[in-house]
Amino acid sequence: MWPPDPDPDPDPEPAGGSRPGPAVPGLRALLPARAFLCSLKGRLLLAESGLSFITFICYVASSASAFLTAPLLEFLLALYFLFADAMQLNDKWQGLCWPMMDFLRCVTAALIYFAISITAIAKYSDGASKAAGVFGFFATIVFATDFYLIFNDVAKFLKQGDSADETTAHKTEEENSDSDSD
């Protein structure tokens, strides 16, 4: 730091050891946990953000630069959901319907990537546009896989909720019915 400290540390560190200090998390607290990054959802979000960034760079370098907004927005949204899932914000902010927001993000991204990739490959002839289209098709597949998995999870959750409601309804009907009315 400037200005330099006029009084240096009076007791230097021992030659072979290191001074134990408090664990300062710093910026490491913002990094996702390794367990989350190794999970299927973490890998999908990493692939989505990586492919979106590569597609964005390809569109910036191509003559199809009119399409660069969609990959940029999808990159930022994928980073946001990666951060939100890694920091477990969905548990902290339960007022938001996280699975539905993630599902809609993936569906719209898959459709938009598919449309602009077809247009970039068919209409433009430079190599960067073709590369952006190919990476866009890969991103379409990754986003479609993600929304398929989210849809299956939501469908399982809703089936469990329906079966619990049905058993509760049957129990209340049995309790309210008069068995002596034969």
UniProtKB/Swiss-Prot annotation:
Residues 1-21 are annotated as: Disordered. Its main location: membrane. One of its GO terms (molecular function) is cytokine activity. Residues 1-12 have a biased composition (Acidic residues). Keywords: Chemotaxis, Cytokine, Membrane, Transmembrane, Transmembrane helix. It is a multi-pass membrane protein. Residues 36-155 form the MARVEL domain. The chain crosses the membrane at residues 64-84, 101-121, 131-151. InterPro entries: Marvel, MARVEL-CKLF_proteins. PROSITE patterns: MARVEL. GO terms for biological process: blastocyst hatching; chemotaxis; positive regulation of B cell receptor signaling pathway. GO terms for cellular component: cytoplasmic vesicle; cytosol; extracellular space; membrane; nuclear membrane. This is CKLF-like MARVEL transmembrane domain-containing protein 3. It comes from Homo sapiens. The gene is CMTM3.
